[in-house]
Amino acid sequence: MPTPSMEDYIEKIYSLIETKGYARVSDIADELFVHPSSVTKMVQKLDKDEYLIYEKYRGLILTPKGTQMGKRLLERHALLESFLSIIGVDPSHIYHDVEGIEHHLSWNSIDRIGDVVQFFENHPDALKTLKAMETNKPETKE
């Protein structure tokens, strides 16, 4: 199993490849706000663990294992953003909150959250009831 840090890299690499068609060490460093040398070390580890194939100065490609994991991690992130949005979390907090919790939930928990999101998507009246509950509560300050 990849560590939370490895997951962040795999997710970002997958996202870059999906949007740009490639992911370079410098792109990954810019996106994750880390030094290129840190990216190189992690990319070498991900290569060793068979999530990607890395050749110095030539770039990297995700293996099928890395592609599958990257897709799953990106979907997890999007699902958690949807869930937090549905339950009424302030949009300005959603990204940060997802970053804080995504590595601490089991895949079983993620699947159950997916069920909740799907329920509210399929039952707009239930979503209206939830939103009504939200508007009847006093606002909390942070």
Curated annotation (Swiss-Prot):
Residues bound to Mn(2+) 1: D8, E99, E102, H103
Compartments reported by the entry: Cytoplasm
Activity regulation note: DNA binding is strongly activated by Mn(2+).
Cellular-component GO terms for this entry: cytoplasm
Record's keyword annotation contains Aminoacyl-tRNA synthetase: no
Keywords: Activator, Cytoplasm, DNA-binding, Manganese, Metal-binding, Repressor, Transcription, Transcription regulation
Residues spanning the signal sequence: none
Gene3D superfamilies reported in the protein's UniProt record: Iron dependent repressor, metal binding and dimerisation domain, Winged helix-like DNA-binding domain superfamily/Winged helix DNA-binding domain
Entry binding sites for Mn(2+) 2: E11, H77, E99, E102
Molecular function per GO: DNA binding; DNA-binding transcription factor activity; manganese ion binding; protein dimerization activity
GO biological process: intracellular manganese ion homeostasis
Sequence ranges assigned to domain HTH dtxR-type in this UniProt record: 1-63
Domain of life of the source: Bacteria
Alphabetical list of PROSITE patterns matching this protein: HTH_DTXR
Described purpose of this protein according to its UniProt entry: Central regulator of manganese homeostasis.
Self-association state and partner proteins as the record states: Homodimer.
Similarity comment text for this entry: Belongs to the DtxR/MntR family.
Classification via PANTHER family: IRON (METAL) DEPENDENT REPRESSOR, DTXR FAMILY, TRANSCRIPTIONAL REGULATOR MNTR
Protein name in UniProt: HTH-type transcriptional regulator MntR
Organism per entry: Listeria monocytogenes serotype 4b (strain CLIP80459)
Gene this chain is encoded by: mntR
